[in-house]
Amino acid sequence: MVTSVKGLAYPKHVTEDAETLARALNDAFGVHLFLDYGGTLVQSGAASRERPAPHVRRKLERLCRSDAFFVYVISSKSVHDLRELIGVPGLGLIGQGGLEIWEDGGELEHPVDIRHVDR
């Protein structure tokens, strides 16, 4: 069975699961939400400087204002590029495939495997 939501057709189990998830998240607190930039916030294979659509930015802003969520965007792009492209207050960024981590208002971190640190 297929259900139509906002003009898009989804198998019924997808919309039922989404509704169940939405109900669970209504009562959630401290949820860490990780979103991929390419293919999630912008189309996969999109131009390297493409910004998320205005409705996507508004949803990110709303999530970041909520006390229930910690929202991060993950990308192979640098944190610097992500900050310029997205620019949503309160959004955490993970760039270079995890080599850079930045939380709004914090310092840029470069995690290093302890095995590679001179002792």
Predicted regions and their residues:
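Active-site phosphate-binding/coordination module
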Residues: 51-119
